[in-house]
Amino acid sequence: MEEPSPVPPAAAPASLAAAPPTTDVLSRRRAHLDSASYRALSRLFSHCLHLHPPRHAARPDAEVEPAAAAAIPPGGSGGLPHGDSPPPADVGGDRGKNLEVEVALGNHAPHETPSTSASPDAAVNPTTDPGVVPQGTEEGRVAGVERVEGVEEVVFAGGTSGEADADGDELGAGAGLMGDDEALRSMQACLDGEDSELVIEMVGNDNEQLQLDAMMNNLSGLIDDASACVMSAQSCGVSGDKLQSDDRVAEEVKELGAGIGNDRSVCSLDHGSLDGGGGFEEGEIEGDTQNLDADDSGNSELQDDVELEEDFDSRRIEEDGSCGHDLKSNLHLIPQKGNGDTARNMLCNSKGDSQMHVARAQAVSYDEVLDWNETPLPDDKALKHGNTRKRTLTEERKAKKTKTKRIKRALQREAEGVKRLKLQPVIKPKVVKVCHFYLHGKCQQGNLCKFSHDTTPLTKSKPCTHYARGSCLKGDDCPYDHELSKYPCHNFMENGMCIRGDKCKFSHVIPTAEGPSTPDAKKSNASSVPEKANCQEQTSRQKTSTVYSGEPATSVPIKHHSILKNLAGISGNAQKVPVRIPRGIQFLPFNKARPDSSILHQDVVSTEKHKNPTGGPHQNFGRPQPADGKKLGKHNGHRSAPLLDEKDSSKQANLHPCSEPKKNSLPTTAAVPSSVSTQHEVSEASRILQEFLFGSGN
């Protein structure tokens, strides 16, 4: 292996001496960071510094690689002005220390693909294109700046030097980084802890929630990048001798640094030049120099993320290979853009700016729309959703509607001059209908019943059985009577005792009988009725007997036939209706009186023959002879006396007419019918006539 020729070291720039220490940068608070983000970054960087303290044991005299020296363009010594002297040799001792610090902080290894870089002039002069980097920028100096939704986290960019020490001790620093895996894990745990704190502090705000998501994604990318840096450093430590002798790789590194430096739109930190021994200035948080808007770095952040992912994948696949092969694959994976793409970069930046502005405008308008939607509209301007259905007319609305119609019609007629006679309506008296069910104590409607309950139900005269048991729930509204003391107790009336005793609500007083209530009394009342009827008949018979007693006997034969007919009709009607007995007539048992009637008929005929021996029986009927007038008068005189004496016995004769047939056989002038067929009827009629005319006298 060929030993590289030493290269004179470059002079230290003035910016290195003027650069503030890391502790001063961390102590100052950035204006563009909120409190939570600033505290998180401060803890993160302080923890990394404590884990990896700086090393002062380094070789004072270090030599650079001739291939790296040849890769540096003329006049472009890392931002140094032309004519500056190279840095002294005693400064090269800090190179190993700076390399370890940068790897611990997440920067790239000396031969790793650099991050985005930009010139400080891009922040100073806003008119120039931030994506264009001047050619005077050092090819190995790369500064990575990542922005996370308003919280800018600055990743310290590790300066790469094209000069390498030919000594084996110089490359031992890269091999010594293999033990930094544990430090990387601790840093990852610290980042996870900081992420959890950020989640707790920023979960309350919706805008900060978006920032939190982007921050977590970028922090995970940062951790992956740091692990890739460690692996790249390890691989470089293994094959460091081969890289020092490869001039072509050095030239590719030069081209890569120049191309990527021209395409980056993010401003880098204050660039420090190489020390005499090749040491680098420690990275610092830029705040005063970086003043870029979030819109200017939108496209660059996307490109950085893509490049870092591709670089990490390639390193994971080829980590067993040589460092030169790894570097070549990275060079092929990362697109290179030179100065000729300035116009294209400007166009991309302008497109990114326009997209960001459009996104912001959309966000603002969306917030305004939300505010406008959340504010309630007044009632008169409220939106009507869907078709409104017509409400059903109630009684009140119908009455109100008809009233308004009548008012409008009346006003219209008044305007037209139409007059209408006002007639008082005829009010018919409303007929009160009594509830039929309430009268019988069965109405279940209560107050809802449409019929009247203003009456006393018929069941009020009956005792309430439920009240007697103590289970009536209707109270005063009960249709039955609750005054049970009016009604006698059945047990006490029938058995003479009551089981309930004094607790019985019915009356235990026996009512006094005003009249006979036994069946014998009823029979006596029934017998008294016909007795009264018989007394009335007797009085009427006495009246009729007094009337007929003053008439002469000669007037009787004139109306004999008519009287017989009337009596025959009366007897027939009496037989048909035996219940109703006319006054003055008493019917006799004719069946028993048949033999008596024949005897009586014979007596009558014999007396007539004796009285009229000379003439026929009908010659002198109704004409008394003058010679015999005295005889008739005497005969009537003799008969009148016994009739008056026997008035007391007339009742007995009426009751038992058949007992004394001789008294009833009085001489009469009744004519006997000639026909034999009517003999029986005539005999009965004559007997009835005698009873009717002369029975009271006997």
From Swiss-Prot:
Entry annotated with the keyword Zinc-finger: yes
Listed PANTHER family: PROTEIN SUPPRESSOR OF SABLE (PTHR13119:SF12), ZINC FINGER CCCH DOMAIN-CONTAINING PROTEI (PTHR13119)
Pfam families registered for this protein in UniProt: zf-CCCH (PF00642), zf-CCCH_2 (PF14608)
Biological process, per Gene Ontology: negative regulation of DNA-templated transcription
Keyword tRNA-binding: no
Ranges of biased composition (kind: Polar residues): 535-548, 665-680
Organism, as annotated: Oryza sativa subsp. japonica (Rice)
Cysteine disulfide links: none
Gene Ontology CC, one term: nucleus
Zinc finger motifs (C3H1-type), residue ranges: 429-456, 458-485, 486-511
Protein name per UniProt: Zinc finger CCCH domain-containing protein 7
